[in-house]
Structures are given as C-alpha cells and as structure tokens.
A protein has these predicted regions:
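Short linear sequence motif anchored by a di-proline
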Residues: 1-131
Length: 131
C-alpha cells in the first residue's frame, strides 16, 4: 500500500505517479484491533451494499529480475484517511483504500492530479465480521 498524501515524498512511489491503474474488487478485508497492542484482532469483510464491483486507485510498475531478465508487473493500492466506518474497523492507523466513485475511473486513469483523489469514500460500504 502507498499513502496518497505522501506519494511525491517516497522514492519507492514518486517515479510511478503517472503509472495509474484500477484495482478491481468485490470486497476487501481489514483487521480491527481488539486490544491495545493488536494481539487480538477481528477480521472484517468490506463490500458495497449492492455487492457490485468497485475500483481502488492504484499505481503499477514493472520490475525486472537482473539475473533472469524476467519482468514482473506489480501494483500498489493507494490509501487515504479512513471514513467513519473504516476508522472504527481499521482502528490502529485509521486508513482505508482509495475507492474511486464510478465517474472518477476515467479521471484517475487520464492523469488528474492525484491529490484530488485523497478523500475517504463516503457511500455504501458494509462491513461484516468474519469468524
């Protein structure tokens, strides 16, 4: 994961800000700390209310193994401050993935300023505790 707020500062990510991708998902998982040190945790499944697919803002790069010359396509999911629901679940760092509204998919891929997407997704996420 990469914090969207610090992309320009981090050497691992600043050269890839223009390498944008959508990471498509139907759900994701987060852990809630039950105790102060995180030794006891509760796993949650997070999805949209309508169970539709959604997209995270991502960056990609190609890593080339210097020995074999084999190329591997890699990606990272961007994170931002948590919305109310995710702050309750991801209660240690209070972060969440950058979930893009449907109308923002094209804008993200076309290179709009990444800082314009540094906001917590506010609608229709449901979290279900898992055994």
């Amino acid at each position: 994961n990469a914090r969207i707020e610090t992309l320009e500062e981090k050497p691992a990510f600043k050269n890839y800000i223009t390498n944008r991708c959508l990471v498509i998902a139907t759900q994701f998982y987060e852990w809630q700390w039950i105790d102060e040190k995180g030794k006891s945790k509760q796993k949650y499944s997070v999805r949209s209310e309508d169970s539709e697919i959604f997209c995270f803002a991502g960056l990609y790069s190609v890593w080339q193994d210097p020995e074999s010359n084999y190329s591997i396509l890699t990606y990272t999911i961007l994170t931002t401050e948590a919305n109310e629901l995710m702050a309750e679940i991801h209660n240690n760092k209070k972060r969440m993935p950058v979930v893009l509204n449907n109308e923002h998919h094209g804008l993200w891929l076309q290179g709009e300023n990444f800082k314009d997407f540094a906001y917590p997704y506010q609608s229709d996420l449901l979290a279900t505790p898992l055994p």
